[in-house]
């Protein structure tokens, strides 16, 4: 196995800028900005605009549009009497 070709996998804190929610996970992404976590250790901080805490799909605030099927659109367009 070649040495020094693998990315540095480390614990980092991701912060949702919309809600302020933070979570600690492992990542190869680095950051110059750091934050002190609940365990007293300092980790790199990565800010994200959307996470599972703010995304409508995960929060249950997603709105579904009624999608007509192909037959329904055909009947609507050409009229079924």
From Swiss-Prot:
<keyword id="KW-0689">Ribosomal protein</keyword>
<dbReference type="InterPro" id="IPR002150">
    <property type="entry name" value="Ribosomal_bL31"/>
</dbReference>
<dbReference type="InterPro" id="IPR042105">
    <property type="entry name" value="Ribosomal_bL31_sf"/>
</dbReference>
<dbReference type="GO" id="GO:0005840">
    <property type="term" value="C:ribosome"/>
</dbReference>
<dbReference type="InterPro" id="IPR027493">
    <property type="entry name" value="Ribosomal_bL31_B"/>
</dbReference>
<dbReference type="GO" id="GO:1990904">
    <property type="term" value="C:ribonucleoprotein complex"/>
</dbReference>
<comment type="subunit">
    <text>Part of the 50S ribosomal subunit.</text>
</comment>
<dbReference type="InterPro" id="IPR034704">
    <property type="entry name" value="Ribosomal_bL28/bL31-like_sf"/>
</dbReference>
<comment type="similarity">
    <text>Belongs to the bacterial ribosomal protein bL31 family. Type B subfamily.</text>
</comment>
<dbReference type="GO" id="GO:0003735">
    <property type="term" value="F:structural constituent of ribosome"/>
</dbReference>
<dbReference type="GO" id="GO:0006412">
    <property type="term" value="P:translation"/>
</dbReference>
<keyword id="KW-0687">Ribonucleoprotein</keyword>
<protein>
    <recommendedName>
        <fullName>Large ribosomal subunit protein bL31B</fullName>
    </recommendedName>
</protein>
<dbReference type="Pfam" id="PF01197">
    <property type="entry name" value="Ribosomal_L31"/>
</dbReference>
């Amino acid at each position: 196995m070649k040495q020094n070709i693998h990315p540095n996998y480390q614990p980092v804190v991701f912060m949702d800028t919309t809600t302020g929610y933070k979570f600690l996970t492992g990542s190869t992404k680095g950051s110059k900005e750091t934050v002190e976590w609940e365990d007293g250790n300092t980790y790199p901080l990565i800010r994200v605009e959307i996470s599972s805490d703010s995304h409508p799909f995960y929060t249950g605030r997603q709105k579904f549009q009624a999608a007509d099927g192909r037959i329904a659109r055909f009947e609507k367009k050409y009229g079924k009497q």
